[in-house]
Amino acid sequence: MAREKFERNKPHVNIGTIGHVDHGKTTLTAAITNVLAKKGQAQAQDYGDIDGAPEERERGITINTAHVEYETEGRHYAHVDCPGHADYVKNMITGAAQMDGAILVCAATDGPMAQTKEHILLAKQVGVPALVVALNKCDMVDDEEIIELVEMEIRELLDSYDFPGDDIPIVQVSGLKALEGDSNWESKIEELMKAVDASIPEPEREIDKPFLMAIEDVFSITGRGTVATGRIERGKVKVGEEVEIVGIRDTRLTTVTGVEMFRKLLDEGMAGDNVGLLLRGVQKEDIERGMVLVKKGSITPHTKFEGEVYVLKKEEGGRHTPFFAGYRPQFYIRTTDVTGQITAFTSDDGANVEMVMPGDRIKMTGELICPVAIEQGMRFAIREGGRTIGAGVVSKIIE
């Protein structure tokens, strides 16, 4: 019974394939499932299964993404693969597919190309912590020297984007040959997965991080006090614990005197729970949607940040016209809209950009009118009159 084995409790890791168009990301993904299927650790999928990915909507943006799952000896993986370059950009920026690590696929026949660079930069900007390189199509290159040169070029490129180029494993593979059942190339896929197991760190579980809950609603209950409701994003909170209310106004301290879920009282709430927290000494008018409750001292509010942004095309429901530095949209952060100004745009090479068109990916500097609990790696939407016109991720906190 292979089915039982599949449900063993292994640590779960989210990964994906990234890299230039036609370098073989989807073929490699199919090859991984086929090689692991022979050990009963995956369901074999062919190129067509993965390439015909259904459309999904994430924050009002349509993205095509294929999801496959498989196991290695020590882990369970969820793996995302996107058919088009624009899908990758949207996926990584919206965090629709949060990646704990990625397999960078680069063809030995071409070496690193424009999107290879762009995906490495994006991985850095959105906080993908680790990469493993699959040097694909190695069956088509006879000259060992060419392969060595391409490897050197990839390592230098990784270094230039602050990834540890010397330490990242580069495994020579052929997705196509492995799919065809060539045992030499199948063993290379196994080698690749061993490198992924070893080099992509296990993500810290949300429950082990410091407590944070974004406030969605506030009620006042006669005789009991004020209750803030929301979904606990990370960590846990116990009755009697001190927490801080952060964002929009000055940070203040309060004590959680009750945790309630589905009208039942709990001793503690934890990551993923939708709860109501009863707060001591707080009036209903003191707190509002958009503030967060956090473990004391774990987070400070900010107003100025850099972000990597994808601007929606007209067909995606975005703007029809370009905008310029000085543009004042709403930033939808966690649970609320905050007005802000985009003070500057810069391109990948650091040059200032005057005008941004629908469909562009751009780096921006934003300034909010009031301090909010923003953090590096956090996702946000840019909205105008209630409709989403862009999606972004905080790449750096300025102040």
UniProtKB/Swiss-Prot annotation:
Residues involved in Mg(2+) binding: 26
Molecular-function GO terms, alphabetical: GTP binding; GTPase activity; translation elongation factor activity
InterPro entries reported in the protein's UniProt record: EF-Tu_GTP-bd, EF-Tu_GTPase, EFTu-like_2, EFTU_2, G_TR_CS, P-loop_NTPase, Small_GTP-bd, T_Tr_GTP-bd_dom
Lineage: Bacteria, Bacillati, Cyanobacteriota, Cyanophyceae, Synechococcales
Subunit: Monomer.
Signal sequence region: none
Annotated organism of origin: Prochlorococcus marinus (strain MIT 9515)
UniProt keyword list: Cytoplasm, Elongation factor, GTP-binding, Hydrolase, Magnesium, Metal-binding, Nucleotide-binding, Protein biosynthesis
G1: annotated span: 19-26
Region (G4) location: 136-139
Pfam families named in the record: GTP_EFTU, GTP_EFTU_D2, GTP_EFTU_D3
Gene field: tuf
Protein name per UniProt: Elongation factor Tu
